Amino acid sequence: MSRLGGVILAAGLSSRMKQFKPLMIIDGKSMIRHVIDLMRGAGVETIVVVTGHNRARIEAHLADAGVLFAFNPDYAHTQQLESLRIGLSALHGHADRILISPADVPLVSPQTVRDLLALSGDFVRPMYHGEAGHPVILDASLIPMLMTYDGPGGLRGAVESSGCILTELDVADRGTVLDNDTPEDFERLRRFFACSNAESER
């Protein structure tokens, strides 16, 4: 049985948001804890949280979460792919497949993750109305390629140019594409959560 690891990307500056995104609260819980709980529920054994801006706050907030931390010292000047590389290095040898998510995509359905994990392929991602979402699943065999990729497009560019087996799953889960970059995005997330709860109670 393959070992499942997780990388949560939480190194960003949150420059367009007036608050620190990973620790913003939805339904009494921080965004990053929503993501951790989603991964734990999917059977992820080892989770690496990549920190940068406000490193100490995240580490204190997650002191009881049973996760590993990896620090991107150049977080203010690097793209997300560099944080991912740091997270993958910390996870090296602990996983055969890796679930990857930013810390600010907190409302993905657990069923969506189960459906993604049921698929094979070097790289698996959800598609919501033609838009690529999160989380994505990476086969550990792709890690050496990601470590040396120097082309455009970040993770997506690396995967799409590699010739690997790319598997896409059409989903009805809007939570896969609802991130949190601006105050308006956060209000949209809160409305989505409220509507989802109302529907589940019917």
Language-model regions, residue ranges each:
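Conserved donor-nucleotide/metal-binding helix-loop-beta segment in metal-dependent transferases, i.e.
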Residues: 108-131
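Short glycine- and hydrophobic/aromatic-rich loop-to-beta-strand nucleating segment
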Residues: 134-138, 178-180
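Conserved alpha/beta core of the MobA/IspD/sugar-nucleotide pyrophosphorylase nucleotidyltransferase superfamily
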Residues: 2, 144, 150-202
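Short beta->alpha linker loops
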Residues: 53-54, 75, 79, 111, ...
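N-terminal glycine-rich phosphate-binding loop and ensuing alpha1 helix
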Residues: 2-51
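A short, conserved beta-strand element in the Rossmann-like catalytic core
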Residues: 14, 106-107
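Active-site acidic Asp-centered loop
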Residues: 101-103
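Conserved N-terminal catalytic core of the sugar/cofactor nucleotidyltransferase
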Residues: 33-97
